[in-house]
Amino acid sequence: MRSQFAWNAGFLGALLAFSAGGGATAATVMAFDEADNGAAAQPRTMILDTDRLRMSTAATDVVFRGDLNKVWVLRSKDHTYLELTPGSLGQIGARMDQAVGQMKEKLAVLPEAQRKQIEAMMAARMGQGAPAAPPQVAYEKAGDSRTVGDWSCAPFQIVVGGKASSEVCIAKLSELGLSRDELTGFASFGAFMAKMTAAMGALRSPMTSINFDSMTKAIGFDGFPVQTTTKFGDGGRQIVVTLKSIQRQAPPAGAFDIPAGYTKIDFASMGRLLAPE
């Protein structure tokens, strides 16, 4: 789940955001490459259309409908989908609490040395629980401007709650040919996901904390990340997401709808839905 949200919510970072398509209105279509630990880059696509958004990978699509205040996570392999709503946030938090409680029960019967080792690993990976308030997000300049693809960008370290979470290279919207209005769906999706991941405590993705107004104030210009590098834990794993192109075109018919024949699943099946191929 963390890996999925690193792209879907953080991009996550750090990856880190669509009316039903087919109309005459052109949507903003962004193509990205995502490289996991130096492996061959995999294509990712994001479609933005007013208050709607669709993010696609080879295995999973995430659709945000601002008009319905819902997110659908679609899995083409088995034609299933998970629906996230504001009302489902409490269910997520309850399941997370239940899972943590079960883990603590299992740890209690282990030898002390082994238990402490596992607890330390869990603390490093998950943190110590949900803070009372969202963590503070800061942008720290991380070197001179550089070129990523066709764009000049300024590198910043994103610091969440006093800890470095990811590095982004941010290009000016004017250079990208984008406007804030075109990013409305992305901003609304980020706000929705921030509420959802807050229910998960320390598993929240730092990229869902991005607020365009706050970011503009912090860095001094309206911008958008053209490259995001997110590191996970102390294991050295990192995911690099790079913007490759921006186009305007009509979205495919039904781009923001649940495809016919898909079956809704519950939260007990969420791990299977979000598991990588």
Per-region residue spans from a language model:
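Bacterial N-terminal signal peptides that target proteins for export
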Residues: 1-11
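Mature extracytoplasmic/luminal segments of secretory-pathway proteins
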Residues: 4, 14-15, 166
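Bacterial N-terminal signal peptides
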Residues: 9-20
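Extended soluble regions of mature proteins
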Residues: 25-277
